[in-house]
Amino acid sequence: MTAEKSKALAAALAQIEKQFGKGSIMRMGDGEAAEDIQVVSTGSLGLDIALGVGGLPRGRVVEIYGPESSGKTTLTLQVIAELQKLGGTAAFIDAEHALDVQYAAKLGVNVPDLLISQPDTGEQALEITDALVRSGSIDMIVIDSVAALVPKAEIEGEMGDSLPGLQARLMSQALRKLTGTIKRTNCLVIFINQIRMKIGVMFGNPETTTGGNALKFYSSVRLDIRRIGSIKKNDEVIGNETRVKVVKNKVSPPFREAIFDILYGEGISRQGEIIDLGVQAKIVDKAGAWYSYNGEKIGQGKDNAREFLRENPEIAREIENRIRESLGVAAMPDGAGHDEAEAMDEEE
């Protein structure tokens, strides 16, 4: 750049900073602009790896959608539990009025410290979200769900009234207001969404999400969560096999998948993931039904191997860190994740 251009640019930058404040424009090489993405673990090792950065990015909007009973709320409660382990503060906007506090506690959520709101209208829910984000003291907000954000006009109207596009306009306006503040306050905002069917679609996917297209655009990460099978112990169903596809990712390559187990009353089975990913990475050996690590057998069948890792959290942590190292993901800090599971086992 010539001296004249450089001088003109410096004057323009000075004028912008004077008018809009320091930090309103900066070079990408500056420390503040080029800092690493801060993340919150999802509680699933496989999903953290699929996201490419080790978890959900802070200061961004995330959408999690899927069919009924696919594990959407369970996944977000696990993220809240992981955030609380780091000392963060979370809020849950329960627009569906269906949060099970006892189940949240079983998943490791520190319920007394969790902020909860059960708003009457969609406008109220989004105003509360806006106020919490602007406070700068909240690290994560979950809105459950977009489909339950009913506009005030719809609640006050008659049952058969047609009000097309009202919810989509509400979401579009709210996200326009929220996005900049979310980035500045480094708050992670998760919207849970439901699936609807488009009528008359002959070709392509007839599924769509509620609330219009604004959330699709403003989301940095979109996760499609599906139940793909049942987990049985003898003849009793004890959980679901779940697949999560990263359909949009602005912080890493998209379209990666993670498959993990969600056990009823326990949440995501981290030990089950460690076994599966350990076998894939050739860190855990599998011969027939037997699993072994470092030449020592850890269990016959996945259930027994899972139980062994639950009883030996040091070995589970060691295997997990080796898996993370082999895949280029940051190692887990000592005491995180497994101590919580150990404490839950002791309570039982």
From Swiss-Prot:
Gene3D superfamilies, per database record: P-loop containing nucleotide triphosphate hydrolases
Superkingdom, natural source: Bacteria
Keyword Acyltransferase: no
Binding site for ATP: G66, P67, E68, S69, S70, G71, K72, T73
Compartments where found: Cytoplasm
SUPFAM superfamilies named in the record: P-loop containing nucleoside triphosphate hydrolases (SSF52540), RecA protein, C-terminal domain (SSF54752)
Keywords: ATP-binding, Cytoplasm, DNA damage, DNA recombination, DNA repair, DNA-binding, Nucleotide-binding, SOS response
Molecular function in Gene Ontology: ATP binding; ATP hydrolysis activity; ATP-dependent DNA damage sensor activity; damaged DNA binding; single-stranded DNA binding
Main localisation: cytoplasm
GO cellular component terms attached to this protein's record: cytosol
Pfam families with a match to the protein in the record: RecA, RecA_C
Region of interest (Disordered), residue spans: 327-348
Example GO biological process: DNA repair
Known function: Can catalyze the hydrolysis of ATP in the presence of single-stranded DNA, the ATP-dependent uptake of single-stranded DNA by duplex DNA, and the ATP-dependent hybridization of homologous single-stranded DNAs. It interacts with LexA causing its activation and leading to its autocatalytic cleavage.
Similarity annotation: Belongs to the RecA family.
Protein name per the record: Protein RecA
Protein source organism: Burkholderia multivorans (strain ATCC 17616 / 249)
